C-alpha cells in the first residue's frame, strides 16, 4: 500500500499482445488504485521457454502505450520477493498459466489472485 492506495502488481511476457492479456490487465486495474506491470525481459523468458517473437524493448513499449498500467517496469526474475519491498504491492495478479506458482507470496501478506 502506498498511502491509502491499494497497489496491484502483475507481470508477464506479453509476447504477441492479445485480447486475454488486455482482459487480465483490465481485471487487475479494477482491483486497486495503482497498477504496476512488469514485462519479462528476453533473458528471463529464455530461462523457462523459447525466446519471445517480439523483442523486449517493443513489448515494454506496447505495455507503456496502452491504457491501464500506471507504471511499467522490466521484470528480471521470477522471484517477486524483492519487488514487494521496493514497490509495496498488496495484490499480485497471475495469469491462468501461473496459478499456484506464487502462493509463497501469501505468506508475505500479499493477496494472490
Over which residues does each language-model region extend?
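Nucleotidyltransferase catalytic core that binds NTPs
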Residues: 1-113
